Amino acid sequence: MKRTPTAEEREREAKKLRLLEELEDTWLPYLTPKDDEFYQQWQLKYPKLILREASSVSEELHKEVQEAFLTMHKHGCLFRDLVRIQGKDLLTPVSRILIGNPGCTYKYLNTRLFTVPWPVKGSNIKHTEAEIAAACETFLKLNDYLQIETIQALEELAAKEKANEDTVPLCMSADFPRVGMGSSYNGQDEVDIKSRAAYNVTLLNFMDPQKMPYLKEEPYFGMGKMAVSWHHDENLVDRSAVAVYSYSCEGPEEESEDDSHLEGRDPDIWHVGFKISWDIETPGLAIPLHQGDCYFMLDDLNATHQHCVLAGSQPRFSSTHRVAECSTGTLDYILQRCQLAPQNVRDDVENDDVSLKSFEPAVLKQGEEIHNEVEFEWLRQFWFQGNRYRKCTDWWCQPMAQLEALWKKMEAVTNAVLHEVKREGLPVEQRNEILTAILASLTARQNLRREWHARCQSRIARTLPADQKPECRPYWEKDDVSMPLPFDLTDIVSELRGQLLEAKP
């Protein structure tokens, strides 16, 4: 079943088409370090973008991090994601794995990634290999280092903005709203700065351009092949920073003299591209990334600007540290949500039947919404990625079994609600209130089950290795006596909708 694009997706696509139409056959200008105005433009238009060259990082940390990348690659722990973009399933050209705080997740392109946990204090984590455990510990060490560097960079940015307060241009009033760290740097700002750099996950990336001959061309500036298209990073705490450690494998690290006369960027060297969102006046930047370089996107840069990754000729790893927005994205969160639904189940029933305490519409509506959340945001997201996480750790096995057991109890709760709707003697008004409360969730459940089932059977899904093949789970056949309701809810939804229509005058 084809998903209807969201209003945000439609608006983004319309902006892109308008921009391409406006450009026609011309390229927008962009700058590289070879251009005289490159650093001036960076300072004026991209002041919240910071580059730390490899020489500023200790050799010991470089060695550990680069060995950790190779370890994760050697053990087959990086995977191309089967993502959903505008209703189409696509395999990302970049292979990834999420490492971070135990129980955290990170969602991008309608795909929820689950952390391979790093060893935070007080945790007891088992990895499948000692080398993988050591690699995760190294990325936690890198995380700590990048956090310190980010806090320092944010403090420097705040100090610069503070120093500029007294030099307000004549055309700007003193109370003109400022974008940035704020006009008064104080103790609260210090707390804010630390929270904006409190990285809880890193998304590891790997790509070998030699094995990806069909990479897209950058469409606006003519920057060449892209490993990652123009985007804002998703699912982050507002105004939080992003820190990236880049490691391109052995190859041409410097431009040769023969290339110095070429316009634009050197296609053999990896670059990160930046542009102001939907701005065709300001030149873009293409910043070369050499082995061990780090860059930082501070404050609201990720919201006001877009970035892309421009492929070089050699394989490249990166570790991208983020403050993932986890208010609805941790195991603790979803377990707490799942505890709400069973609170409506009576405990004094002797057999396996489920009896409900309340048929209040608001209570039933909340229960069905939680039912959908655990099924489609957690269980199906996890199993759609096959058994990939077992390559690194079994940390998620028990929690997923627990969530599935809670979900199964919710199926029984839904069944009890449907029995109540059919009960003879139930007042019509009360029946209609119940139907109105649950119908939207049941309709969404049916549509989403059909969509996820189709995605698992798609041609591209069938090409994946056995341990990465999507699994449509939970799934059961009609004759499965252990399940109170069918997998396919088409008939039930149709019947409920008909009852509601009949009741209307």
From Swiss-Prot:
**UniProt-listed Enzyme Commission number(s):** 1.14.11.-, 1.14.11.53
Q: How is the cofactor bound?
A: Binds 1 Fe(2+) ion per subunit.
**Entry's localization field:** Nucleus; Nucleus speckle; Cytoplasm
Which residues fall in a coiled-coil region?
A: none
> Pfam families, alphabetically?
FTO_CTD, FTO_NTD
Q: What does the entry list as the binding residues for 2-oxoglutarate? A: 205, 295, 316-318, 320, 322
Catalytic activity entry: a 5'-end (N(7)-methyl 5'-triphosphoguanosine)-(N(6),2'-O-dimethyladenosine) in mRNA + 2-oxoglutarate + O2 = a 5'-end (N(7)-methyl 5'-triphosphoguanosine)-(2'-O-methyladenosine) in mRNA + formaldehyde + succinate + CO2; an N(6)-methyladenosine in mRNA + 2-oxoglutarate + O2 = an adenosine in mRNA + formaldehyde + succinate + CO2; N(6)-methyladenosine in U6 snRNA + 2-oxoglutarate + O2 = adenosine in U6 snRNA + formaldehyde + succinate + CO2; a 5'-end (N(7)-methyl 5'-triphosphoguanosine)-(N(6),2'-O-dimethyladenosine) in U6 snRNA + 2-oxoglutarate + O2 = a 5'-end (N(7)-methyl 5'-triphosphoguanosine)-(2'-O-methyladenosine) in U6 snRNA + formaldehyde + succinate + CO2
Q: Name one GO biological process term.
A: DNA alkylation repair
Which parts of this chain are annotated as the region Loop L1? 213-224
Q: In which broad location class does this protein mainly occur, judging by the first location in its UniProt entry?
A: nucleus
**Superkingdom, according to UniProt?**
Eukaryota
Name the chain's protein: Alpha-ketoglutarate-dependent dioxygenase FTO
Q: What organism is listed for this UniProt entry?
A: Pongo abelii (Sumatran orangutan)
